[in-house]
A protein has these predicted regions:
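A short acidic, Gly/Pro-enriched loop at the edge of an enzyme's catalytic core
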Residues: 336-345
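Class I SAM-dependent methyltransferase SAM/SAH-binding core
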Residues: 284, 288-334
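Conserved alpha-helical positions within TPR/SEL1-like repeat arrays
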Residues: 17-25, 48-59, 82-93, 116-127, ...
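Short, glycine-/aromatic-enriched active-site segment of Class I SAM-dependent methyltransferases
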Residues: 376-397
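A short glycine-rich, Lys/Arg-flanked "PGG" loop and its adjoining helix->strand segment in the class I
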Residues: 358-370
């Protein structure tokens, strides 16, 4: 049987672009990239091919290329609301918030019913300190698309930060109605109940969650945070991996909305130490996350190593191009297994996932070379917490008393300087923290705790 003409003919350009988009939607990104490449070789100014090749470049982490391609497509066809919305997403990922806001506004001007553009605009208005406008944008998205889960979730987070906790809880309830097993909304609703003094309702949410998913690390950890019962000595590996893998892509933009200052505070503490930008030191970024500290400590480093438990976070750290090695490992295990040692160790917002710090601080001290320096941040327990070494807070991180930290550093043979500072905001309130610098002398003798 001879093949028919229709089964052997070449695709038209439009068919090829549509096929590439289908591959893209099915997450066959390499195959889609090849089809777009061949189309653009034939027709370099094909608007749809340019645009969706740009979207693909963004999906593959090539934001500069994505931006150039999408802007070329819009120069050719400037009346596409979806395309401006996609431009906003790329600009937002690149932390160009003002331009992203403009892109979302252009999308809305072209198509006022574009719910996603309204929702994403709300995120950026909140990030740039415009809560009233952000609320209006979220509500516009919900009015246009009543099942818009992201808009309801983000509106709830905004309202919670404005101390409108009951309204926030109503938003989370709506999300759960739309998607009953939405993990973030379940967690946020339970925490809202805790804030309102309705601990029993929070417990019910987490216990129902654990009945459905026994051993779920998020539910188990947050149940302990709400009740103060069965508090673990540190967050489990599962909790850390699940939490940070789930929002690695949006991690930096979320921290920007929280006025996150930990990396800058660590950099200031290093400057205060008199350490020179010599590129001579072996440096460890302990709990490197997406690499926010990497560029700040790179000038000190002959070799810079980043360690983190989240593969998603490490993937973003790699894009910073400042690390000589990135290693997926639990921090204490890595430190104990490492035999080379470091001249400088920095750690921001990592030890807040440890309650009992004795083991990890001993491991950090053991990994320091003589005259080595350790700089890290912790959240400070409220009111000094006399007699309390650490506490698991409602947000799921641990806070520590300064006296406890000083005692452990002395026990580990480290000479310390501790500065109190605001690390970030959370739910509209400042989060008090400790910025610690600890030095290891040539001769170290441990004392009794």
């Amino acid at each position: 049987m001879e093949p028919s003409e229709s089964s052997t003919r070449e695709l038209t350009l439009e068919e090829a672009v549509s096929f590439a988009i289908l591959l893209q939607q099915n997450e066959q990104l390499a195959e889609a990239h090849e089809v777009f490449r061949r189309v653009l070789e034939t027709a370099p100014d094909h608007p749809r091919a340019l645009h969706y090749a740009g979207v693909l470049a963004h999906q593959q982490g090539r934001n500069s290329e994505a931006l150039a391609l999408i802007e070329r497509s819009l120069a050719l066809v400037p009346d596409q609301a979806d395309w401006y919305s996609n431009l906003g997403i790329v600009l937002q990922a690149d932390d160009r918030l003002d331009r992203a806001i403009d892109a979302y506004r252009r999308a809305i001007a072209i198509d006022p019913s574009h719910a996603n553009a309204h929702s994403n605009l709300g995120v950026l208005l909140r990030a740039t300190g415009k809560p009233v406008e952000a609320e209006a944008a979220y509500r516009a998205a919900i009015r246009l698309k009543p099942e818009h889960i992201d808009a309801y979730t983000n509106l709830g987070i905004l309202l919670n930060g404005l101390k409108r906790t009951e309204e926030a809880a109503a938003c989370y309830c709506k999300v759960i109605t739309l998607r009953p097993k939405h993990r973030e909304a379940r967690k946020l609703l339970a925490l809202a109940h805790c804030t309102l003094g309705e601990v029993d309702k929070a417990v019910d949410i987490f216990e129902e969650w654990l009945e459905e998913e026994p051993g779920d690390p998020i539910a188990r950890h947050m149940l302990a945070a709400c009740t103060g019962r069965d508090v673990p000595e540190r967050a489990s590996n599962g909790f850390v991996e699940t939490t940070f893998d789930s929002f690695a892509a949006s991690f930096e933009s979320k921290l920007a909305r929280l006025s996150y200052r930990a990396p800058a505070l660590v950099a200031a503490m290093l400057e205060d130490s008199g350490l020179e930008h010599s590129h001579r030191l072996e440096v460890l970024d302990a709990g490197c996350g997406t690499g926010l500290c990497g560029a700040l400590v790179a000038p000190f480093a002959r070799r810079l190593v980043g360690v983190d438990l989240s593969q998603g976070m490490l993937a973003h750290a790699k894009e910073k191009n400042v690390y000589h090695a990135l290693i997926k490992a639990e921090l204490t295990d890595y430190l104990r297994d490492n035999s080379e040692g470091f001249d400088l160790i920095v750690s921001t917002d990592t030890l807040v996932y440890f309650g009992d710090l004795k083991g990890v601080i001993a491991a950090l001290a053991g990994a320091l070379r003589p005259n080595g320096l350790l700089v890290f941040t912790l959240e400070q327990a409220a009111g000094g917490s006399a007699g309390v070494d650490y506490r698991l807070e409602l947000h799921g991180r641990y806070s520590h008393s300064q006296a406890y930290v000083e005692r452990l550093l002395t026990f580990s043979g480290l000479q310390s300087k501790i500065v109190q500072a605001q690390l970030r905001t959370e739910a509209g309130a400042a989060v008090p923290g400790l910025v610690i610098r600890a030095a290891k002398s040539v001769s170290v003798q441990q004392a009794e705790v």
